């Protein structure tokens, strides 16, 4: 799995979670059970943590990133579509995030 330590922070992967061989997961990232990170997706937990809930999938080419003081939480049973950029936000359980969506810090999607 393409998991990268940043400082003292190493991604944590839940049971049966899957990360595509060319995805990038770096730093303070926690993947829930049965989560999946698809081709060319990037999750950068470099400023604050990223939490991906159980049974959630981050589809191809999406980028998830945090700002200092603005962590990211993606709920359970969420589909983040292809080429989505999420930046320091919260996505509620079961929420779909459409293709090519852009969300800036502190926004909440429910």
Descriptions of predicted regions:
Residues 10, 106-107:
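Low-complexity, intrinsically disordered short peptide segments enriched in small/polar/basic residues
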Residues 1-94:
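Domain-scale signature associated with acetyltransferase and cell-envelope carbohydrate enzymes
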